[in-house]
């Protein structure tokens, strides 16, 4: 299986945390959570390779430093036929589809999983179980802890990725035929967008890079892994 992880430009990342963290602090946290997410993915034997999709050179440098392939996100150069700028979810889904097509053009028919880049409490065992469940075939999703978003999207066999990320993505993926995967995977289901999400991952236990970032922010979590 090939994992795809998308990361937007650091200057616009985690805007919902802007009330508590300045731009530099948010960028530091994003990079730390990405580092821990990639480390967890690397610990899962069922995942052979990883691609980070990003337009950001700092994110790309981190990915290269841990031996991950980078696909240059074409989203910043995408425009609609009427000249308007596409919505964020449109550019994200276009970038993911382009990356998936590139991967399969080079590697043939491979199973794919798109993972959120901000899963600092995810455990290798959780992802291993989700991969095993997804391999029964077709498209499937791990719904996030809010019940509305998507933490992971799988496309196995010859199934197209067909990403529907954006508001209410869990519903969008379900309506397009993706089946929900059932499992007690709190770390896998908890991506970080808000201060409440940060509290949740603190309680679950975060990876070392995220712990260090939170410590720098003087918000040391009570638990770590």
Swiss-Prot record:
The keyword Aminoacyl-tRNA synthetase does not apply. One of its GO terms (molecular function) is phospholactate guanylyltransferase activity. Pfam families: CofC. InterPro entries: CofC, Nucleotide-diphossugar_trans. It is an enzyme of class 2 (transferase). Transmembrane segments: none annotated. Keywords: GTP-binding, Nucleotide-binding, Nucleotidyltransferase, Transferase. Phosphoenolpyruvate binds at residues 150, 166, 169. Guanylyltransferase that catalyzes the activation of phosphoenolpyruvate (PEP) as enolpyruvoyl-2-diphospho-5'-guanosine, via the condensation of PEP with GTP. It is involved in the biosynthesis of coenzyme F420, a hydride carrier cofactor. This is Phosphoenolpyruvate guanylyltransferase. It comes from Rhodococcus erythropolis (strain PR4 / NBRC 100887). The lineage of its organism: Bacteria, Bacillati, Actinomycetota, Actinomycetes, Mycobacteriales. The gene is fbiD.
């Amino acid at each position: 299986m090939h994992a795809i992880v998308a990361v937007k430009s650091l200057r616009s990342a985690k805007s919902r945390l802007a009330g508590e963290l300045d731009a530099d602090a948010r960028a530091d946290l994003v990079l730390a959570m990405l580092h821990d997410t990639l480390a967890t993915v690397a610990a899962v034997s069922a995942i052979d390779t990883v691609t980070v999709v990003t337009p950001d050179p700092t994110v790309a440098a981190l990915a290269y430093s841990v031996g991950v392939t980078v696909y240059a996100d074409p989203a910043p150069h995408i425009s609609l036929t009427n000249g308007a700028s596409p919505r964020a979810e449109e550019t994200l889904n276009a970038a993911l589809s382009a990356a998936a097509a590139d991967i399969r053009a080079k590697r043939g028919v491979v199973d794919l999983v798109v993972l959120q880049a901000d899963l600092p409490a995810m455990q290798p065992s959780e992802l291993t179980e989700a991969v095993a469940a997804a391999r029964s075939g077709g498209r499937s999703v791990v719904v996030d802890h809010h019940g509305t978003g998507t933490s992971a999207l799988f496309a196995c066999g010859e199934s197209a990725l067909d990403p529907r990320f954006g508001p209410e993505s869990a519903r969008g993926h379900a309506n397009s035929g993706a089946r929900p995967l059932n499992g007690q995977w709190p770390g896998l289901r908890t991506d970080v967008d808000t201060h409440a999400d940060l509290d949740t991952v603190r309680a679950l236990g975060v990876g070392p890079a995220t712990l260090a970032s939170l410590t720098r922010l003087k918000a040391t979590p009570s638990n770590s892994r």
